[in-house]
Amino acid sequence: MLYKGDTLYLDWLEDGIAELVFDAPGSVNKLDTATVASLGQALEVLEKQHDLKGLLLRSNKAAFIVGADITEFLSLFLVPEEQLSQWLHFANSVFNRLEDLPVPTLAAVNGYALGGGCECVLATDYRLATPDLRIGLPETKLGIMPGFGGSVRLPRMLGADSALEIIAAGKDVGAEHALKIGLVDGVVKQETLIEGAIAVLRQAITGDLDWRAKRQPKLEPLKLSKIEAAMSFTIAKGMVAQTAGKHYPAPMTAVKTIEAAARFGREEALNLENKSFVPLAHTNEARALVGIFLNDQYVKGKAKKLTKDIETPKQAAVLGAGIMGGGIAYQSAWKGVPVIMKDINDKSLNLGMTEAAKLLNKQLERGKIDGLKLAGVISTIHPTLDYAGFDRVDVVVEAVVENPKVKKAVLAETEQKVRPETVLASNTSTIPIGELASALEHPENFCGMHFFNPVHRMPLVEIIRGEKSSDETIAKVVAWASKMGKTPIVVNDCPGFFVNRVLFPYFAGFSQLLRDGADFRKVDKVMEKQFGWPMGPAYLLDVVGIDTAHHAQAVMAAGFPQRMQKEYRDAIDALFDASRFGQKNGLGFWRYKEDSKGKPKKEEDAAVDDLLASVSQPKHDFSDDEIIARMMIPMINEVVRCLEEGIIASPAEADMALVYGLGFPPFHGGAFRWLDTQGSAKYLDMAQQYQHLGPLYEVPEGLRNKARHNEPYYPPVEPARPVGSLKTA
């Protein structure tokens, strides 16, 4: 053994070939600060070996290196800029030493090589991969850019266009694509990976392969003519401006850095990467996006822990076909859980099957599946008008009309047709689970399961624990949602649960703005372009359905009369009374026509202004900041109340529910991350300016207390140790 660290070791393999093996404690390898330091120490030992002829890098895990240790990021990002820059210089000196070894080097890559893992293998001369490879640089999705030489080496290896596509979009690619673009040199089966790697190294050692020529382009300026460079970078910047926008600075910074570094060799190019990385790491956007990644891991880990002793349902059923029922049935079948779809008429069943078939055909058109796979999936969805087969169902989700009487009747009838241990769930969006459970003989086997539309796209499923829901019931439904590829978050029962409970105060803030003379078009523009929502409130209401919102608004007002009961006729009432129900009938705040792809396209409609004039004061031009404050304060206050009341268990789960269920702008990180970034005292000062608008604007006592003590909702993070101690960690 030449060297042994905590996460890697170095040993002779055969005949002058050494192997450097990543083998961290636990199930995966991460390129954390300690591993980078250990890699440097291993290379120091290796550089003294006069008999060295070649080096093989490999992993003892199912994945090569899954990336940097993102749990370290928040503390690293608090390190002063100069120290962070020094740490990056040190880390890059390690990878440069790997790249500069006087012998051929090869990385045998299995499974994932992402982020720092990808940057590590870019420093070797050759890369051999297994068919399960996923390799790429996802850093821009975390609000940063590659910092270990990825933005320098990848363009010089692949050419500007392919590299820009991966780096700016934060993409990873599979083995076949990686081979095609030159990111790996060969793909072999797992069982022959090491044998193949040694064979390639031998060819390089004997001179049959020119490893020096392979290495040289990574050390030089990017080979692009002025015209080629102008085309590549202009197109890339245009694409990034269109897709990422101003709220996500990392992709544009990465493109501009690669452009600026194109005329330099490795050392100066790495300096430019360093100078770009450090300011990005100190942005609120990076902290928010890293926070989302960590929250996502926390939420998924919690679901995994909850279901560790539970068998995933093998047979499911959906009550109520149509768009929603068909979407749920498709998602379950697509992920391998057969589903019975029951309705009371053929028309609805046909609609549900058509929806499932449409979604599968889209997968076929995109080349994701073949006809055989399509037929196999669709054959596991069984439409029926009766309860045949319900005696072997493990879990049933009811997705009928949002009417408590109808839902109770359907659930009570179904309970008599299933096994005693079968779990029943309701896909209600607002009706309290306790109310629906009152119709059942075994309420302990019942809970809420709130999917979001469109089911195949929206990652969140709210799992609602009723007062009598058993732990086993919740675990079974969480297991099914996880199997469907969704992110389940368990909340406690109340009107609207979590997501709709916090959404309707936001809509109430919108209604009050319109009442006070705001133009809905400007409100939409500000909330989309300035705050960053994917849709403004008017557009969102049209998509949700004005009739749906009108009904839900009444349910929420009954549930929380003190805050959500309004004493005036609002814009939603006016549109509802005029039968303007939004996209579903082509008229809402906007008028809708189908575009060439059959999707609804919004257009101005002057008639809506006359309609809204009856429920509004004369036009008043509100500032952008006023609009944002009046829209967001009611939502933030309600989110805080939900945490204080135990409706949602943690700030992390609340923020993920908002991001995954409502599209809360990821660069803000969620309501609690946004609050912590603003500072609770600053938020309180802002909110108090609007408390005259009513109870929705009154800040909860718990938040007032946080402001008094200047406390954040997330645990405070300490800066990482000084860079000097990081080197020898």
Swiss-Prot record:
Superkingdom in the source lineage: Bacteria
One Pfam match, given by its short name, reads 3HCDH
- Give residues annotated as binding NAD(+): M324, D343, V400, V401, E402, K407, S429, N453
Q: Which reaction does it catalyse?
A: a (3S)-3-hydroxyacyl-CoA + NAD(+) = a 3-oxoacyl-CoA + NADH + H(+); a (3S)-3-hydroxyacyl-CoA = a (2E)-enoyl-CoA + H2O; a 4-saturated-(3S)-3-hydroxyacyl-CoA = a (3E)-enoyl-CoA + H2O; (3S)-3-hydroxybutanoyl-CoA = (3R)-3-hydroxybutanoyl-CoA
Q: Which Gene3D superfamilies does this chain map to? A: 1.10.1040.50, 2-enoyl-CoA Hydratase, Chain A, domain 1, NAD(P)-binding Rossmann-like Domain
Which residue positions does UniProt flag as site: Important for catalytic activity? E119, E139
Q: Which UniProt keywords apply?
A: Fatty acid metabolism, Isomerase, Lipid degradation, Lipid metabolism, Lyase, Multifunctional enzyme, NAD, Oxidoreductase
Instruction: Kindly give the InterPro entries that the UniProt entry links to this protein.
Output: 3-OHacyl-CoA_DH_CS, 3-OHacyl-CoA_DH_NAD-bd, 3HC_DH_C, 6-PGluconate_DH-like_C_sf, ClpP/crotonase-like_dom_sf, Enoyl-CoA_hyd/isom_CS, Enoyl-CoA_hydra/iso, FA_oxidation_alpha_subunit
GO BP terms, alphabetized: fatty acid beta-oxidation
Positions of the catalytic residues: H450
- UniProt key word rRNA processing: no
Output the Gene Ontology cellular-component terms. Answer: fatty acid beta-oxidation multienzyme complex
> Where on this chain does substrate bind?
D296, N500, Y660
Molecular function GO labels: 3-hydroxybutyryl-CoA epimerase activity; delta(3)-delta(2)-enoyl-CoA isomerase activity; enoyl-CoA hydratase activity; long-chain-3-hydroxyacyl-CoA dehydrogenase activity; NAD+ binding
The annotated pathway is: Lipid metabolism; fatty acid beta-oxidation
Q: Where is this region: Disordered?
A: 708-729
Q: Where is this region: Enoyl-CoA hydratase/isomerase?
A: 1-189
Q: E.C. number, please?
A: 4.2.1.17, 5.1.2.3, 5.3.3.8, 1.1.1.35
- Spans annotated as 3-hydroxyacyl-CoA dehydrogenase: 311-729
Q: What does this protein do?
A: Involved in the aerobic and anaerobic degradation of long-chain fatty acids via beta-oxidation cycle. Catalyzes the formation of 3-oxoacyl-CoA from enoyl-CoA via L-3-hydroxyacyl-CoA. It can also use D-3-hydroxyacyl-CoA and cis-3-enoyl-CoA as substrate.
Q: How does it assemble?
A: Heterotetramer of two alpha chains (FadB) and two beta chains (FadA).
The text of the family note is: In the N-terminal section; belongs to the enoyl-CoA hydratase/isomerase family. In the C-terminal section; belongs to the 3-hydroxyacyl-CoA dehydrogenase family.
What name does this protein carry?
A: Fatty acid oxidation complex subunit alpha
Species whose genome carries this gene: Salmonella newport (strain SL254)
